[in-house]
Amino acid sequence: MKDVILRKIKNNLVVSCQAVGEETLNNDIAITLMAKACLEGGAKVLRLSQYSHIKSIKSISGKTPIIGLIKSNYENSEVIITPSIKEVDLLLSLNVDCIAIDATNRKRPSETLEVIFKYCREKSPNTLLMADCATIDDVKNADKLGFDLIGTTLRGYTKETFGKSNMDNDYSFIKECLSSIKTPLIAEGGIWEPYQVKDLLDLGCFAVVVGSAITRPKEITKYFLKALDN
């Protein structure tokens, strides 16, 4: 089962279709229509967040592989992406193909990353696990733990990596990751141009995730206006 899903993800564009908080598209109908439009455009894999959004989108997505996560805010932790077993259980109940988990070395609200990983493996051994990382140490640790996929998702989103991008210095961080691990690497974060997707696949990335540049109209508009200002 895992191999079938991995084959569907390999060498593909993964479209991240998410909306949280005060974002205009943060309702089930809007985000489902956005996902439907992406599927009509040819998207073969979706990365989705939030229980009700995933449940709604699954009703129209057929056999499209879904990488699922739940963003939750806890007062005692900066970890937001699937931070505890509580979120894991919700995702397992949705039967997503892959669960994305924050795999940074930051303090978690309850269970450690190792405990969550073990829980997932025991509870649902056929569900893929993706480690969302920010640093090379995160990446190496996720590789050691045995994650099925490792993503560069959180590069630039932690205090340690603030101001850094996966696109810096001709993809130097991506290249370092690729040379350091055997686990399939998914490039994610800061990707705004089609040529970058091709570059990253040519470098050896297993797949590439694009979100804002496709599914966040507000950010796309700001991107174009910034170009005009420059």
UniProtKB/Swiss-Prot annotation:
GO annotation terms (biological process):
carbohydrate metabolic process; N-acetylmannosamine catabolic process; N-acetylneuraminate catabolic process
Q: In which pathway does it act?
A: Amino-sugar metabolism; N-acetylneuraminate degradation; D-fructose 6-phosphate from N-acetylneuraminate: step 3/5
Keyword annotations for this protein, in alphabetical order, are: Carbohydrate metabolism, Isomerase
Q: Which InterPro entries match?
A: Aldolase_TIM, NanE, RibuloseP-bd_barrel
Q: Which domain of life is it from?
A: Bacteria
EC number(s) on file: 5.1.3.9
The record's GO molecular-function terms, alphabetically, read:
N-acylglucosamine-6-phosphate 2-epimerase activity
Q: Which reaction does it catalyse?
A: an N-acyl-D-glucosamine 6-phosphate = an N-acyl-D-mannosamine 6-phosphate
Q: Note one Pfam family from the annotation.
A: NanE
* Cellular component, GO, one term: cytosol
EC class of the enzyme, as a word: isomerase
What family does the Swiss-Prot or TrEMBL record give for this protein? Belongs to the NanE family.
Known role: Converts N-acetylmannosamine-6-phosphate (ManNAc-6-P) to N-acetylglucosamine-6-phosphate (GlcNAc-6-P).
Name used for this protein in its record = Putative N-acetylmannosamine-6-phosphate 2-epimerase
The source organism is Malacoplasma penetrans (strain HF-2)
What's the name of its gene?
A: nanE
